[in-house]
Amino acid sequence: MLLRLVGAAGSRALAWPFSKLWRCGGCAGSGGTVWSSVRACGIALQGHLGRCSQQLALQGKLTSFSPRLYSKPPRGFEKFFKNKKNRKSASPGNSVPPKKEPKNAGPGGDGGNRGGKGDDFPWWKRMQKGEFPWDDKDFRSLAVLGAGVAAGFLYFYFRDPGKEITWKHFVQYYLARGLVDRLEVVNKQFVRVIPVPGTTSERFVWFNIGSVDTFERNLESAQWELGIEPTNQAAVVYTTESDGSFLRSLVPTLVLVSILLYAMRRGPMGTGRGGRGGGLFSVGETTAKILKNNIDVRFADVAGCEEAKLEIMEFVNFLKNPKQYQDLGAKIPKGAMLTGPPGTGKTLLAKATAGEANVPFITVNGSEFLEMFVGVGPARVRDMFAMARKHAPCILFIDEIDAIGRKRGRGHLGGQSEQENTLNQMLVEMDGFNSSTNVVVLAGTNRPDILDPALTRPGRFDRQIYIGPPDIKGRSSIFKVHLRPLKLDGSLSKDALSRKLAALTPGFTGADISNVCNEAALIAARHLSPSVQERHFEQAIERVIGGLEKKTQVLQPSEKTTVAYHEAGHAVVGWFLEHADPLLKVSIIPRGKGLGYAQYLPREQFLYTREQLFDRMCMMLGGRVAEQLFFGQITTGAQDDLRKVTQSAYAQIVQFGMSEKLGQVSFDFPRQGETMVEKPYSEATAQLIDEEVRCLVRSAYNRTLELLTQCREQVEKVGRRLLEKEVLEKADMIELLGPRPFAEKSTYEEFVEGTGSLEEDTSLPEGLKDWNKGREEGGTERGLQESPV
């Protein structure tokens, strides 16, 4: 309603009093009324109020209804509408210099190269120009669409359909009384009866017919029976009309096409906001992004992978100081492949590189190259490398490169062919670099084994940087990074706490450690603790390892007793076997999918003997043996234990060559989720493998049964104590079973003994001392924040 009235009144006549109102000191909706502002204007508005009083009254109603419209003045009127704080301090002599528009700002404001931020009040500018407040192009489109819809609605739903009658009624009421002017046979389906003007109130009536021949015979017979002379008989006219069914059938198709066209125009592939301006032809443009200086990750935030950090620092140094290497005849490596398990910090290391290196950093995901259109992948690869050459020297990071870098020749479907074409284009582009391009390509993947050899060869990715799970020193460094933002208890030392937590989390990756610290803070907040304490971290570690604690899960007394003796069997076997992992805690409170939970502290070692693996198998069978020994029956609770025992036995026989009958051979096992189409050994060998696995598992079971038979009283003690307390710590186990008869390591200092210093070696080589600044800078100017390493 506002737009309609303003347009009718004339925008120029209404714009002048609006500007006077703002000049006189404020918004009508934020403290006063429009008429008070008018009185404050004085003589300036006295001559114009007679002509525009109605417009001002309308503005007063609207401002009281929606003050948000006037909470911010339009552009061009900021100096007339100042904040209350600035009104007192502002003086007539102070002038604000006009804001300089950006060089490449779009029509919407000063947002940058691609249009930037739009106007807050575009309708006000149009009113100043004497135009309607709405956009003409959009209004014309909407007007045409609305007119078409209205016309169709009026035609199909408001036309007079006439009154339907029967043949008998037509003969008796119209034909016999001589009220018929003419008969119109429409589309050979029905007859429209046009009465003589002035005889009836209806314009026409109609009735259906079976066929034209039958209608003609019946009409002739009826007129003969009524004695109507041939000269007075009703005229019959045959016409063809459209009933709109064809147009109605086209409506769904037209609506669907309109929606698709609108989506293509306004969406990412169209020319609307956020589009690249090329419609369907823009799908071949790269989706790679050039990261700006708003990356808040630095190398100081990356720990536990110092060797990989040195490699990445050297790549940045290649681009910053190429002369240092070219003087010795060295060539800049073209790329590096970051590999390793999930959560070890590959992408985080790339983010830190983007935050530290003051060279352009271009990032893209491997899955963004493959789309529904054929040829999009190679086109985007070409466009991406063209962008990289344009911004050289720069770093190009391709995350999850296995999406396009899989080995070729493994499929014949269209998607596989498109992936191979994208990979071929990638190979060509990487080979097309010369030594002066100064573009370094980094890539990250969790599956280096499935990559094409042509992609990983030297000359494309010269270096393979493996980032594995951190050791105990690396975990301590990672804990220090993630403990920084936490509000710890005043009695806790970050160094001591990080070392203790590192000893409690063997095998954890950087992502797991980050999750532990976050869970500890959440647990502390859940209990309204003023700070994060050590017990919160212990609970968080149990939460990550064992899953969610289910204290409300109801177990039958018999089931609870079975679970208690099952866990007691695990604990006792591990306590009296030399190569078993030390026990930290055992609980019969359900966690995750399990009904019981035991936490061990495994040693970090890379080489295992046959005796060590055999003791681990015995420890995993302790629960099943305890059930058989104390209850005379077995349950399904040992399913996960049996699966691990079977995997360990097959690995010893098939992969590690620890079987005397099978010999010193090793066969590959399929990965989890993969299927082995063809076995690499014969049926006789497969039968021998199965026999050896059964024999090994049987030996472990018999040894475990013998051990628990000897320690039956100890298992009974642990089982009864578990039923009483539900959770047993290591101190409780020492009280019940006595000290463990074998030496074990449990502290950080014991684990790192004999490995040099207590912390990671973070020293840099001489050539990388000033890795993040050019030699020509002379040590005075730095690109970005230097790494503290």
From Swiss-Prot:
Q: Where is the composition biased (Basic and acidic residues)?
A: 767-789
The record's catalysed reaction(s) read: ATP + H2O = ADP + phosphate + H(+)
Q: Per its database record, what is this protein's job? A: Catalytic component of the m-AAA protease, a protease that plays a key role in proteostasis of inner mitochondrial membrane proteins, and which is essential for axonal and neuron development. Afg3l1 possesses both ATPase and protease activities: the ATPase activity is required to unfold substrates, threading them into the internal proteolytic cavity for hydrolysis into small peptide fragments.
Subunit structure, per the record? Homooligomer. Forms heterohexamers with Spg7 and Afg3l1. The m-AAA protease is either composed of homohexamers of Afg3l2 or heterohexamers of Afg3l1, Afg3l2 and/or Spg7.
InterPro entries membership: AAA+_ATPase, AAA_lid_3, ATP-dep_Zn_Metalloprotease, ATPase_AAA_core, ATPase_AAA_CS, FtsH, P-loop_NTPase, Pept_M41_FtsH_extracell
What does the record list as GO biological process? cellular response to glutathione; cristae formation; mitochondrial fusion; mitochondrial protein processing; mitochondrion organization; protein catabolic process; protein processing
Q: Where in the cell is it found?
A: Mitochondrion inner membrane
Residues given in the record as ATP binding sites: 302-303, 344-348, 482
List, as start-end ranges, the regions of compositional bias called Gly residues.
Answer: 106-115
Q: Which residues bind Zn(2+)?
A: 566, 570, 641
The identity of this protein, by name, is Mitochondrial inner membrane m-AAA protease component AFG3L1
What is the cofactor note?
Binds 1 zinc ion per subunit.
Residues spanning the membrane: 139-158, 246-264
Q: Where is this region: Disordered?
A: 81-121, 749-789
* Active site: residue positions: 567
Family according to the record: In the N-terminal section; belongs to the AAA ATPase family. In the C-terminal section; belongs to the peptidase M41 family.
Q: Name one GO molecular function term.
A: zinc ion binding
Q: Where is the transit peptide?
A: 1-70
Name the coenzymes or cofactors required. Zn(2+)
EC number(s) recorded for this UniProt protein:
3.4.24.-, 3.6.-.-
Q: What happens when the gene is disrupted?
A: No visible phenotype. Conditional deletion of both Afg3l1 and Afg3l2 in mature oligodendrocytes triggers progressive motor dysfunction and demyelination, leading to rapid oligodendrocyte cell death. Conditional deletion of both Afg3l1 and Afg3l2 in mature oligodendrocytes also causes premature hair greying, due by progressive loss of melanoblasts that share a common developmental origin with Schwann cells.
Q: Which NCBIfam families match?
A: FtsH_fam
Q: Which GO terms describe its cellular component?
A: m-AAA complex; mitochondrial inner membrane; mitochondrion
The effect annotated for residue 567 to Q is:
Absence of proteolytic activity. Loss of its processing into the mature form
* Iron in keyword set: no
